[in-house]
Amino acid sequence: MAEDEYMRRSTFTDQPVTYGAVGATHAADLLYYPPKGYKPLERSIRLGSGDERFETAATALMAWGVQKGSGIQVTDVTEGTGVQYEGVEFGPDGTPMRMRANRPEEDVFADDGTPFVRNGMTAVLKIPFGPFRVSAPIRVVYVIDEPHRRGFAYGTLHGHPESGEELFLVEQHDDGTVWFVLRALSRPSNAFYRIVSPVLAAVQRRYTAKYLRALHPASSA
């Protein structure tokens, strides 16, 4: 690895997220009580039903399937150092309890060699915008791994057009139906993006629609 790339990655992985309400997307009432200054969003779509559908969707999700299925490149994936952030741990009622210690885990990779999502991981998302790709650095701030709920949330790092957090969740309800849930809070990250906020909002709406389609069986048919 070239020295300049090593320095860039080292600095990037040690960066803190650019917002204070880490873990806020875990709260089901985010739409009603968002952090001050942030715009909340929640959308969901039914993916089908049954255990096989849940496992298929959850596995794709944890392999960055929502992002890749929306045309976003997932690049510069690293484990992070844990210096700035170790993750939130939640109690049975969803209340944040303490920071989650980094634990050794077996590395798991998608078919294309991309590491599966893990807590504390950092990446740079390359988002298509016309003939260009906008770089959006992120850090995974928590992972949900339950029998009928699987997903992760990432927070923004310096250089991202937005400041905030986004949750991607696959869950199986008591009736066997499988749903994809997208929950987010965001605001423009700096003065430039505040000026072009109507454009930023339009891009967000476009990718929200793409995210909701990415795991649907019809998209891979």
Which sequence ranges carry the predicted segments?
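Hydrophobic residues positioned within well-ordered beta-strands of beta-sheet architectures
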Residues: 41-43, 123-125, 136, 152, ...
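Hydrophobic ligand-binding cavity/cleft-lining segments
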Residues: 1-124
